[in-house]
């Protein structure tokens, strides 16, 4: 089946007298209501596309299937690409962790908890699986042909831990060598993975400075049994590093990394350092995809 993810590709496809079956993904097609008339769309699916009433009628009349977004849910049924940090953290301004609760990512998490992690209404469960399927599709498009190193676990590792620095240095070195770094997208060892990739275009001394800054915890929290990610300023410290060491467009393109977190563990904010975030509702699907991405090397940390 063809996958159409741009209006140029859609227009070329539409010029055929009988378009081949295609998945039309997350496109705004409201201006095409006239061109959609009298076409046959048997076998084609329109996923999360913006359509006017006339366009929808023409597609259904032509034998196509429309899967729209749910107006009662905050997330789309289908995405044609992975999330970015700016998208998930929209609404967060760099303050304490309570301020993170105003962002888009946490809005979805609250909705996730309200509907239930597992025993959900049928429509909600269906839309979650559709969303996760599109994340997997976008993930595989991104890693295709790449040399991948994946690191999972280790969410309890503190930023001041020597292993955090070692992982960041290794990740930076591998990223510069052309490997695509992938992690579970959470705190600890996973965050170190993305921090290393984040600084691949900068001198290592700057990364060392950043780690020294990001690892300073509030003194009252040092004896806490909860992980460092429970610190009220955990995210703010990382956000300050992003602000003080911004990445250029070329760095983002040349040194990408992918976080694969889940709303199932949504109490842990995702790391703000990867260029791409493949966030899932289903933890089992997320774990399965993390193990099946054919990584050249796979590392897992305890804790």
Annotate the PLM regions.
Residues 10-33, 37-38, 42, 47-50, ...:
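Acidic/glycine-enriched connector segments
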Residues 51-53, 156-158, 182-191:
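Gly/Ser/Thr-rich loops at beta-strand to alpha-helix junctions
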């Amino acid at each position: 089946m063809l996958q159409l993810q741009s209006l140029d590709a859609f227009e070329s496809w539409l010029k055929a007298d009988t378009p081949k079956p295609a998945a039309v993904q997350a496109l705004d097609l409201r201006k095409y209501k006239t061109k959609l008339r009298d076409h046959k769309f048997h076998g084609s699916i329109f996923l999360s596309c913006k359509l006017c009433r006339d366009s929808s009628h023409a597609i259904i009349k032509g034998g196509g299937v429309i899967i729209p977004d749910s107006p009662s849910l905050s997330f789309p049924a289908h995405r044609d690409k992975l999330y970015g940090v700016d998208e998930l953290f929209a609404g967060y301004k760099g303050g304490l962790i309570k301020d993170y609760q105003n962002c888009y990512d946490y809005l979805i998490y609250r909705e996730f908890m309200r509907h239930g992690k597992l025993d959900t209404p049928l429509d909600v469960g269906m839309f979650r699986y559709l969303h996760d399927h599109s994340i997997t599709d976008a993930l595989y498009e991104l890693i295709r042909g790449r040399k991948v190193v994946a690191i999972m676990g280790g969410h309890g590792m503190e930023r001041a831990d020597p292993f955090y620095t070692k992982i960041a240095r290794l990740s930076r070195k591998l990223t510069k060598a052309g490997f695509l770094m992938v992690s579970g997208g959470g705190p600890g060892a996973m965050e170190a993975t993305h921090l290393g990739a984040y600084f691949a275009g900068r001198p290592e001394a700057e990364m060392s400075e950043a780690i020294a800054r990001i690892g300073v915890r509030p003194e009252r929290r040092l004896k806490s049994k909860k992980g460092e990610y429970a610190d009220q300023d955990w995210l703010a410290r990382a956000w300050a590093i992003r602000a003080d060491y911004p990445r250029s467009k070329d760095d983002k393109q040349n040194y990408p990394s992918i976080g694969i977190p889940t709303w199932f563990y949504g109490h842990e904010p995702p790391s703000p350092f990867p260029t791409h975030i493949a966030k899932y509702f289903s933890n089992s699907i997320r774990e399965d995809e993390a193990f099946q991405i054919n990584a050249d090397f796979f590392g897992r940390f305890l804790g």
